[in-house]
Amino acid sequence: IWDSTISINLTAQWHLIRAMEPLLIAAPAGRAVLVSSGVAERIAPFWGPYAISKAGLEAMGRVWAGETEQTNLRINMISPGGTATGMRASAFPGEDPDSLPQPDDIAPAFLTLLSPNCQDHGKRFKARSMLGL
């Protein structure tokens, strides 16, 4: 579990960032939103690899934001919060998915951070808080 989780949630993100950075910097309003999780900032027993990968992703995002401070690129992190997804259903099989927002419900938070009007940089946001959910 460790290797696959770190590979997907951290290593692949690093390679994607390095590959896309020139295009994002060249764009008049390049935006990158890294998807984190609440487990990145709290103790989550039995969630070690996932929590560590998301905490690492947030650190990588903050470092990348510092490296691109003098460009038009804006980088932020977002934690969607509990959302009715297949991954969530697998992790919490007893949870009622109807009690959670749907992905479409939280999408506007992502769009806000991807907007050319967004000037935030190197910050972490909670999607549900942004939307009052």
Positions of predicted regions on the chain:
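A short, exposed helix-loop element centered on a Lys and neighboring polar residues
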Residues: I17-R18, R62
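A structural motif corresponding to the C-terminal end of an alpha-helix
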Residues: A19-L23
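C-terminal helical subdomain
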Residues: Q70-L73, M77-I78, T85, G94-L133
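Catalytic loop of short-chain dehydrogenase/reductase
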Residues: I1, I25, R31-G56, G61-Q70, ...
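Active-site Tyr-X3-Lys motif and surrounding loop/helix of classical short-chain dehydrogenase/reductase
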Residues: I1-S7
